[in-house]
A protein has these predicted regions:
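Low-complexity, highly charged intrinsically disordered N-terminal segments
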Residues: 1-26, 30-33
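Charged/polar, solvent-exposed surface patches and flexible loops
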Residues: 3, 7, 34, 38-41, ...
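Active-site-adjacent bridging/hinge elements
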Residues: 6-15, 36, 68-77
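An alpha-helical support segment within catalytic cores of ATP-dependent transferases
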Residues: 21-54
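Short, surface-exposed helix-loop/turn micro-motifs enriched in polar/charged residues
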Residues: 31, 50-53, 58, 72, ...
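Catalytic activation segment of kinase domains across protein kinase-like and atypical kinase folds
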Residues: 51-58, 62-107, 126
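Internal, well-ordered alpha/beta segment that forms a basic, Gly-enriched binding/recognition surface
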Residues: 87-152
Length: 152
């Protein structure tokens, strides 16, 4: 595995790379963040995930690739914010990677295993429910919120 990681990072600034490797050794969550390529190399082996349709995916979705930004319409949005690894791939890949990051991140925060499992189930249930509606949600179009924002 170390050889694969070194090969992937070949040609990068040695000083910054040393810092990256040192940081990756600090926790499984940070290791996950720094090795998206390992995730993608191993995922195609899991054929069950390939049955899902292809879609544009973030490619490196994890807890720290979300953030807020202010749009031209003056609204602040919270969404994915890192698309360096975006790809046309199985629509399940981002879900799997995000769930792995939730498990690792919550372990670092010392959440009990039952709490982590519950959080992951809630994510999958909510995600499935939202997909079933067949539409994107935009908070500024959600009635009361829009009226409140317009008044302020």
């Amino acid at each position: 595995m170390a050889l694969t990681i070194r090969k992937f990072n070949k040609g990068r600034d040695p000083e910054r790379l040393a810092m990256k490797y040192a940081k990756m050794r600090t926790s499984p969550f940070v290791f996950l963040r720094g090795t998206f390529h390992l995730f993608h190399q191993r995922l195609p082996v899991e054929r069950v995930l390939e049955r899902a349709p292809k879609a544009w995916v973030c490619g490196d979705l994890h807890l720290e690739n979300f953030g807020s930004y202010k749009s031209d319409n003056r609204f602040a949005y919270f969404n994915m914010n890192d698309f360096d690894e975006a790809a046309l791939a199985s629509c399940t890949w981002d879900v799997v990677r995000l769930l792995i990051s939730v498990r690792l991140g919550m372990r670092e925060l010392k959440l009990e295993a039952s709490g982590i499992a519950s959080l992951c189930r809630e994510f999958v249930d909510s995600y499935t429910r939202e997909l079933a509606t067949g539409k994107a949600r935009r908070i500024e179009q959600e009635g009361k919120w829009c009226a409140w924002l317009s008044a302020h």
